[in-house]
């Protein structure tokens, strides 16, 4: 596979998460599409709250945000000794770790920095601080590079024509470009993407608010549908492939993604439509054997009872899982930053990590 485009050739959007001068900068995704605003965060607690309340969202984006939270701690800590600094480091680590339970990138990024620090405990404190900041930036930069590779891998295997996607796995969900976002942007640049169908993605409307905004901003041909119209457009022969992101892929190929993904996978099988997941290696959790082991976040009932801040239902009990799990039997292929993985996933994912 040859990488033919640079990030700036594929999107006009800035990075969704950045760190400079002891400040984490993030696009506030809660305000879109009404307002585009980059907000500054200068404490670990404020970064953690931004992850929790979905100011920043998307597995790779929250992984980078958490890493930058540790960088922020390192550069603002007033600890006078290494022991005092490490006590504060572990507190910051736990604060960031306890924000959202499903996306594995969060834990992967935090544990990567924690492991590095613990390997260098004999180093001078200033060097440990620099290690943390540099590693956090490396995590963010690697995400952009991974997305670029996934974009080109995906463009090689997806059919020309109309794609359907769910939620937002675009630039906003990552540091830059996106997972699904990179694939559809490369295909758009190549001229092979004719139309991108966007599910609205209730209850938080990431498809309607975020995907519709960012893809139309970059000039892609998009069409928004209600979630319950997906089966009909498939039945009408208007979808050539389905492409979704993944917050956590496990060893057998099952994966967790935004609630409603499983439904699309079953519908794709019924209509003979290829169904692909796109995610970097950092989203693959080989420690879990099946999707039944993935913790599923349940969010506030208010997300279902309201829409755009307006009450749309009476005060009734609500079940609001943020994710569902798609069994691997429905998955045509998994597009990673190393290559496309095909069934049997249990064997081929193990082989993928054996190549590391």
Curated annotation (Swiss-Prot):
<dbReference type="InterPro" id="IPR005251">
    <property type="entry name" value="IF-M1Pi"/>
</dbReference>
<dbReference type="GO" id="GO:0046523">
    <property type="term" value="F:S-methyl-5-thioribose-1-phosphate isomerase activity"/>
</dbReference>
<comment type="similarity">
    <text>Belongs to the eIF-2B alpha/beta/delta subunits family. MtnA subfamily.</text>
</comment>
<dbReference type="InterPro" id="IPR011559">
    <property type="entry name" value="Initiation_fac_2B_a/b/d"/>
</dbReference>
<feature type="binding site">
    <location>
        <begin position="57"/>
        <end position="59"/>
    </location>
    <ligand>
        <name>substrate</name>
    </ligand>
</feature>
<dbReference type="InterPro" id="IPR000649">
    <property type="entry name" value="IF-2B-related"/>
</dbReference>
<keyword id="KW-0413">Isomerase</keyword>
<dbReference type="InterPro" id="IPR042529">
    <property type="entry name" value="IF_2B-like_C"/>
</dbReference>
<feature type="binding site">
    <location>
        <position position="100"/>
    </location>
    <ligand>
        <name>substrate</name>
    </ligand>
</feature>
<dbReference type="Pfam" id="PF01008">
    <property type="entry name" value="IF-2B"/>
</dbReference>
<protein>
    <recommendedName>
        <fullName>Putative methylthioribose-1-phosphate isomerase</fullName>
        <ecNumber>5.3.1.23</ecNumber>
    </recommendedName>
</protein>
<dbReference type="InterPro" id="IPR027363">
    <property type="entry name" value="M1Pi_N"/>
</dbReference>
<feature type="binding site">
    <location>
        <position position="206"/>
    </location>
    <ligand>
        <name>substrate</name>
    </ligand>
</feature>
<feature type="site" description="Transition state stabilizer">
    <location>
        <position position="167"/>
    </location>
</feature>
<dbReference type="GO" id="GO:0019509">
    <property type="term" value="P:L-methionine salvage from methylthioadenosine"/>
</dbReference>
<feature type="active site" description="Proton donor">
    <location>
        <position position="247"/>
    </location>
</feature>
<keyword id="KW-0028">Amino-acid biosynthesis</keyword>
<dbReference type="InterPro" id="IPR037171">
    <property type="entry name" value="NagB/RpiA_transferase-like"/>
</dbReference>
<keyword id="KW-0486">Methionine biosynthesis</keyword>
<comment type="function">
    <text>Catalyzes the interconversion of methylthioribose-1-phosphate (MTR-1-P) into methylthioribulose-1-phosphate (MTRu-1-P).</text>
</comment>
<feature type="binding site">
    <location>
        <begin position="257"/>
        <end position="258"/>
    </location>
    <ligand>
        <name>substrate</name>
    </ligand>
</feature>
